[in-house]
């Protein structure tokens, strides 16, 4: 139990800006639980956003346009911008149209290129649009927890099954002490939490199933794509999957609710 708790705290330290003032050893037991808790860390970020949305959406002066922007940036800030940085690095490398070795070098370069900036603007613009349109339909706050829950569950799976692009870096550090069993744990925890949200009617079963299916397709497609384009997975690739996945999942929510409203 202590190892699980330390792994949970380590996940919060690494993947969120929640202040955990405690030194936790980076060892096999803690890292295994860190990987298992990745979806839960995402769900916590989403739950905080859901709480903010539920609290302030009751005010008559609330505007979907403003709230879409605030909730968008709240989610990115709570994740420390870590995954957005990975998305930018992957975009720079992919749009360089160079060979695999050069793309790996570009992802390791701390400098930011034009394609990274343009790609992030495009990504966040579409997410803001999907959020704005969805908020106007009166979506349940629980969806803010479901989206980051599923995006990080997909990243945990990709971490366990994908070929490593290099023996160093964040993905290699996590993979050193974890295995596919830990990914099964992560997927199981995500499934249980999503099922509870559906059972409590916080999210409809149809919406939950559609989001889960979309997350599965994204993670499954990311594996061969990353191995072809970058020689395997890296921490940046995992971050790109999380950020890109959240935008796609919000697009699915928008399509589902716009079709119902229509």
From Swiss-Prot:
Transmembrane region positions? Answer: 4-26, 37-57, 59-79, 112-132, 139-159, 183-203, 205-225, 237-257
* Membrane topology of the entry: Multi-pass membrane protein
Which InterPro entries does this chain map to? CobS
Q: Name one GO cellular component term.
A: plasma membrane
List, in alphabetical order, the GO biological process terms annotated in this UniProt record: cobalamin biosynthetic process
One Pfam match, by short name? CobS
Record key words, sorted? Cell membrane, Cobalamin biosynthesis, Magnesium, Membrane, Transferase, Transmembrane, Transmembrane helix
| Descriptive protein name | Adenosylcobinamide-GDP ribazoletransferase
Q: Which GO terms describe its molecular function?
A: adenosylcobinamide-GDP ribazoletransferase activity; cobalamin 5'-phosphate synthase activity
User: Of which family is this protein a member?
Assistant: Belongs to the CobS family.
**Subcellular location field:** Cell membrane
Cite the EC number. 2.7.8.26
Cross-referenced PANTHER family: ADENOSYLCOBINAMIDE-GDP RIBAZOLETRANSFERASE
Source organism, top-level taxon: Bacteria
Q: What does this protein do?
A: Joins adenosylcobinamide-GDP and alpha-ribazole to generate adenosylcobalamin (Ado-cobalamin). Also synthesizes adenosylcobalamin 5'-phosphate from adenosylcobinamide-GDP and alpha-ribazole 5'-phosphate.
Enumerate the cofactors the protein uses.
Answer: Mg(2+)
């Amino acid at each position: 139990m202590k190892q699980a708790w330390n792994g949970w705290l380590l996940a919060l330290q690494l993947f969120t800006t929640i202040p955990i003032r405690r030194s936790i050893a980076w060892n096999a037991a803690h890292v295994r639980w860190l990987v298992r808790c990745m979806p839960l860390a995402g769900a916590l970020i989403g739950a905080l956003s859901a709480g903010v949305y539920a609290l302030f959406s009751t005010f008559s002066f609330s505007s979907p346009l403003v709230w879409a922007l605030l909730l968008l940036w709240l989610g990115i800030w709570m994740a420390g911008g870590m995954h957005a940085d990975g998305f930018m690095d992957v975009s720079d490398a992919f749009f360089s149209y160079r060979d695999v070795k050069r793309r790996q070098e570009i992802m390791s370069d701390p400098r930011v290129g034009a394609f990274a900036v343009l790609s992030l603007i495009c990504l966040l613009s579409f997410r803001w649009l999907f959020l704005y349109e969805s908020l106007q339909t009166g979506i349940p706050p629980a969806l803010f927890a479901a989206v980051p829950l599923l995006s990080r569950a997909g990243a945990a799976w990709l971490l366990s099954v994908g070929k490593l692009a290099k023996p160093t870096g964040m993905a290699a550090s996590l993979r050193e002490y974890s295995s596919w069993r830990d990914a099964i744990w992560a997927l199981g925890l995500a499934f249980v939490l999503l099922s509870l949200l559906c059972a409590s009617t916080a999210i409809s079963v149809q919406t939950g199933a559609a989001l889960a299916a979309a997350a599965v397709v994204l993670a499954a497609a990311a594996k061969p794509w990353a191995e072809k384009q970058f020689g395997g997975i890296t921490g940046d690739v995992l971050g790109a999957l999380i950020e890109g996945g959240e935008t796609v999942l919000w697009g699915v929510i928008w399509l589902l609710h716009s079709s119902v409203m229509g």
